[in-house]
Design a protein with these regions (language model features):
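Vicinal oxygen chelate
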Residues: 1-12, 15-25, 53-58, 79-166
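Alpha-helical elements of the RecA-like P-loop NTPase motor core of helicases
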Residues: 30-31, 104, 141-142
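Short beta-strand/turn micro-motifs at beta-sheet edges
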Residues: 5-8, 77-83
Length: 166
């Protein structure tokens, strides 16, 4: 190995880039995430082990955070026999909404589709107003309002945060 990258653009420091989930049907999962979140398909692929897809926020090309979905073909799961357990009930992906009404709207849509897991409900201050929805594989996605993530990050780290040390 030469240490050379196959890509022209990459991070200058260790950077949070993705979370990966095993799914039963990558196409159904893409459709669900595009219907219930702001994520959009960035790339898809297939190899001898299965199918995959990358979804992300198209408004953040300079600091992408990607949801990787992987569907393994029968007998081709490189992690077998370990089971792929869904995230939940506490483990979840969090999306902060701009308003309480936005949380109510997604909760109503999820309830109509049969995938509302919790709420909407007002939780303690550091959690905010939330609902939990379930993807086709049972993974939990939280929509919240007023958690204060943006405010706390700017308060502690400022707009020009120092790079993390590795």
């Amino acid at each position: 190995m030469t240490g050379q990258s196959n890509h022209a653009v990459g991070p200058k420091r260790p950077t949070w880039t993705h979370i990966a989930l095993a799914v039963r049907d990558v196409d159904a999962s893409i459709a669900w995430y595009e219907a219930f979140t702001h994520l959009r398909l960035l790339a898809r692929g297939e190899d001898a082990d299965g199918k995959n897809a990358w979804l992300g926020d198209p408004t953040q090309p300079d600091s992408p955070f990607i949801l990787v979905l992987g569907q393994f073909f029968e007998g081709r799961d490189p992690f077998a026999p370990a089971p792929h357990l869904p995230m939940g009930p506490f483990a979840h992906m969090g999306i902060e909404a701009p308003s309480r009404e936005a949380v109510d709207e997604i909760a109503a849509r999820a309830k109509a589709a049969g995938c509302l897991g919790l709420g909407p409900v007002q939780m303690p201050k550091q959690i905010g107003y939330v609902c939990f929805i379930k993807d086709p594989d049972g993974n939990t996605v939280e929509y919240s309002f007023d958690q204060g993530v943006y405010e706390k990050a700017r308060e502690v780290w400022g707009r020009q945060a120092q790079p993390a040390r590795v």
